[in-house]
Amino acid sequence: MGKVGNIEHIEERAETELMPPSMYKVILNNDDYTPMDFVIEVLQLFFNKNEQEATDIMLAIHHQGKGICGVFPFGIAETKVAQVNQFARQNQHPLLCSLEKA
């Protein structure tokens, strides 16, 4: 009988541990200096966007001030933000990538 109680407890605990992770939007913010071609390159390189998808997102960034590159679990989103910001600085562009909870 004690085993049944333990099994129920383990099953209940396993269910609570399987909650989906919080998701975060990775966002590129518009600026007046970063070339559109560089933004397209970033979208293709870091977010696996094809030419048309990258162009559409770049135009949204240009016209709306920001654009969503993708939605990811926090750890992945945080890594992509850091990679994009580092790549932009290495290429001497002020492009800013950020994240916000989805």
From Swiss-Prot:
GO terms for biological process: protein catabolic process; proteolysis. InterPro entries: ClpS, ClpS_core, Ribosomal_bL12_C/ClpS-like. It holds the Pfam family ClpS. Belongs to the ClpS family. Binds to the N-terminal domain of the chaperone ClpA. Involved in the modulation of the specificity of the ClpAP-mediated ATP-dependent protein degradation. This is ATP-dependent Clp protease adapter protein ClpS.
